[in-house]
Amino acid sequence: MLYPSIDSLMDKLDSKYTLVTVSAKRARELKEDDQRGPLVGKPKSFKPVGVALEEIVEDHLQYERKEQ
């Protein structure tokens, strides 16, 4: 079984599109900036995308939708 599950992630965000956008942006930040460490204490994943998903499920990442 994958961690975190898609169900637990969808409880935190409003759509799969938002999930992909937020996690990809955070993963890019983790990969490009060595001084930025993970926001979770000890991530289970070694890959930046997995770490970003763990941060989302543990409420370390927030997003704000801009109205147009």
Curated annotation (Swiss-Prot):
Protein family membership: Belongs to the RNA polymerase subunit omega family.
Covalent S-S links between cysteines: none
Record protein name field: DNA-directed RNA polymerase subunit omega
SUPFAM superfamilies documented for this protein: RPB6/omega subunit-like (SSF63562)
The protein's assembly and partners: The RNAP catalytic core consists of 2 alpha, 1 beta, 1 beta' and 1 omega subunit. When a sigma factor is associated with the core the holoenzyme is formed, which can initiate transcription.
GO BP: DNA-templated transcription
Classification via NCBIfam families: rpoZ
GO annotations of cellular component type: DNA-directed RNA polymerase complex
Taxonomic placement: Bacteria, Bacillati, Bacillota, Bacilli, Bacillales
Keywords assigned: DNA-directed RNA polymerase, Nucleotidyltransferase, Transcription, Transferase
Keyword 4Fe-4S in record: no
A GO MF label: DNA-directed RNA polymerase activity
Catalytic activity reported: RNA(n) + a ribonucleoside 5'-triphosphate = RNA(n+1) + diphosphate
E.C. no: 2.7.7.6
